Amino acid sequence: MTPDDLLEEFRAAGALLEGHFILSSGLHSAVFLQKMAIFSDPVRTARVCAGLASVIRDRYGAVDLVVSPAIGGIVPGYETARALGARAIFVERDPGGPFQLRRGFSIPAGSRAVMVEDIVTTGLSSRECLAALRDQPGEVVGAACLIDRSGGRADLGAPLVALATLDIPNYPADQLPPDLAAIPAVKPGSRATTPG
């Protein structure tokens, strides 16, 4: 699957939205990628995650585990793991706390794991997920995502491979361009932020 193929999947699913959006990072953007419109379709999800699995194999080789941040990363993590023939586990947080492996999940010594995200904007969730894995005995070889909307600038502290890399401008609330500021903002994402 090429980056253009992935974007066509988003368009066909009605998941490539234009307007004024407050992202889960708190930044504002004229473009929102509504990944749940992709993930609500099992066939489409399997197709895009198989594409990501191919990119992971090319970059990192064989992996035993896919680790994703809950909640948004669980579906693409699971489907990507299935395409890789790997196990899927996830990190989650107690309210207000850091991500951690729970439910008996671990990265055993000798295993190779990749962290899989859906969409990377600033890389915050990915960095937090990777931090939760640092003390595991197995090796975390890197990270992967369907779309890196930072244009390749997000620093995860680990290698990142994306099925598509886009350079979509994002703005702090106090630095909006006039055309974006003229449109009422909506918050379609999952992480609570204060509109501004």
Swiss-Prot record:
It holds the Pfam family Pribosyltran. The keyword Metal-binding does not apply. It is an enzyme of class 2 (transferase). InterPro entries: OPRT, Orotate_PRibTrfase_bac, PRibTrfase_dom, PRTase-like. One of its GO terms (molecular function) is orotate phosphoribosyltransferase activity. The keyword Cell membrane does not apply. PROSITE patterns: PUR_PYR_PR_TRANSFER. Its cofactor is Mg(2+). 5-phospho-alpha-D-ribose 1-diphosphate binds at residues 117-125. CDD domains: PRTases_typeI. One of its GO terms (biological process) is 'de novo' UMP biosynthetic process. Keywords: Glycosyltransferase, Magnesium, Pyrimidine biosynthesis, Transferase. Its EC number is 2.4.2.10. Pathway: Pyrimidine metabolism; UMP biosynthesis via de novo pathway; UMP from orotate: step 1/2. Orotate binds at residues 121, 149. It catalyses: orotidine 5'-phosphate + diphosphate = orotate + 5-phospho-alpha-D-ribose 1-diphosphate. Catalyzes the transfer of a ribosyl phosphate group from 5-phosphoribose 1-diphosphate to orotate, leading to the formation of orotidine monophosphate (OMP). Homodimer. Belongs to the purine/pyrimidine phosphoribosyltransferase family. PyrE subfamily. This is Orotate phosphoribosyltransferase. The gene is pyrE.
